[in-house]
A protein has these predicted regions:
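Non-catalytic signal-transmission and effector/linker regions of two-component phosphorelay proteins
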Residues: 1, 42-134, 141-142, 149, ...
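Conserved phosphotransfer microenvironments
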Residues: 1-27, 31-42, 49, 61, ...
């Protein structure tokens, strides 16, 4: 997780350096608001930053970032191989998905814990929680279409404001 305000180093250059050394490591940019992102002189690409999140004062955004990365990395294996369900979120605003994801993850964990039997062992509870629905985030029509095709049998819901880019046009 990279902050915008790093002394003597812009976050894009820092993210690019990390990606050169560790190409598969996710790099997340955490900004205080959209104006910080607009002040960055270089265009943000996947070669430097995987996703931008906005800090709104709620520490649960960190848990959401970690779960988002876990779901992104494990989605294919868990959904296809283990028949785990998924929720597709189509949202192009970092501020919006930074607020929605913590809420969704909290609710999913709450519901899974509610369904758990009280007499399960700790290892069984952990296994049960790992089987929670995965959350798939995309920011545009093409990404949503790709994910729907790939996981169509396992998508249990789609959350969207129905206002997102298609062919880079909003």
């Amino acid at each position: 997780i990279v902050m915008v305000r790093i002394a003597d180093l812009d976050p894009i250059s820092f993210g690019t350096e990390i990606k050169k050394k560790y190409p598969k490591k996710p790099v997340i940019l955490l900004a205080f608001d959209e104006s910080e992102i607009k002040q960055i002189p270089i265009k943000i690409t996947r070669d430097s930053i995987n996703r931008i999140f906005i800090w709104s004062g709620d520490a649960s955004v960190f848990t959401a970032i970690i779960k988002y990365i876990e779901d992104k990395i494990n989605a294919s294996k868990d959904i296809i191989d283990s028949d785990i369900r998924a929720i597709l979120i189509i949202e192009d605003s970092p501020r919006t998905y930074s607020k929605i994801l913590p809420f969704i993850y909290k609710e999913i964990v709450f519901q899974v814990k509610h369904l758990m039997k009280k007499n399960l062992s700790l290892s069984q509870k952990i296994l049960y929680l790992r089987g929670r629905p995965k959350v798939l985030l995309t920011t545009n029509y093409e990404g949503a279409k790709r994910l729907m095709r790939k996981y169509q049998q396992n998508i249990i819901g789609v959350i969207s404001d129905v206002k997102f880019p298609r062919r880079n046009i909003l």
